[in-house]
Every structure is written in structure tokens, then in C-alpha cells.
Amino acid sequence: MNHPFRILPLLWHARRPSRIHNMIAVADTFWLRKGYEALTFFGFILVHSRQEAERINNRMDTLKNHETIHLRQAQSCGDSWLRFYWKYMVFWWKARKARRKIRNAGYLLNPFEMEAYAHMNDLHYLDRQPDGCATGWKRYAQMSLDERLILLKQKRH
């Protein structure tokens, strides 16, 4: 998919986060920007190519785990994609204040991304969570922006 309106069928078929058990990867070069490997979009994983979509659809790996964590975060936001995306955008907007200190601050200091990156290599992380929900983002959301920045810098070194 490379046209902006081709995303409409995905929206039409969107289901509540709790009703999705296996996210399907779909190739979309329009909505997925350079520098990003994948994007969770209303229960689908958008990737750059059909080959990558097939690879993700056929096995669980760290990238699919990262995106599945976002699915479970949406479940923890009242089982609503709209609440999840609203909170995501608010966190992103607030974290932009640190953009002079770190590139892509809105993304990297977003509590949802911090939880997903912290646990993406642990393929059993979600299995250990109550009800399979990912709520670690709430701990990051309670931190100040400076505390999140310090934590991010510690993890990078």
C-alpha cells in the first residue's frame, strides 16, 4: 500500500484491542516513515515491504513483540484505540520539550515506547503480566521528563 486512503480498509476492520490475539503485518510505504521499522495501527502492524510482513506474520520476534506490547497498552487504556492514540499524542507532545537534549525526544521519551523498548527482547514479558495487559508505561508516565531522559541515557550506555 502506498496511497494514504488505502489505510481505510484497516480502519474499517479494526477491532477492540482485547479481541485481537495475533496482529497481522501489512506492507505500507506511505504511512511508515523513514527510520521506523514498524507502526501499530488499530491492531495491524505496518511495515515497509511484503517480505517483511510475511516474516513477521510467520513468527514471533522482537519487532512483533514490541508492536504487540503496544496492543496490550491499548488494552490497558480502557480497551480503546482512540484513548491509546490520544494519550500517545499527549505524551509525545509533552516530551518534545526535550528535543534540544535528544533527537526524537517525543518518540523516545514517550512512556509507551519506553515500556515497549525495555521489554521487546523478552518474548514472554506479556505472558507474565496480569490479564496480558502492558501497564509498565504508567510507571514511566509518573516520572518527570528529566527522569525519563536520565533513564534513557543510562540504558544507552
What label would you give each PLM region?
Residues N58-R59, C77, Y85, P130:
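General "foldedness" signal
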Residues E37-A38, I45-N65, Y107-L108:
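Short pre-active-site segment immediately N-terminal to the catalytic Zn-binding motif
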Residues F30-W31, Q51-A53, I69, G78-D79, ...:
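Short, solvent-exposed loop/turn segments at secondary-structure junctions
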Residues N2-Y36, T40, L82-H157:
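Metalloprotease/metallohydrolase-associated module, dominated by Zn2+-dependent proteases
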Residues T68-K87:
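Catalytic Zn2+-binding segment of zinc metalloproteases
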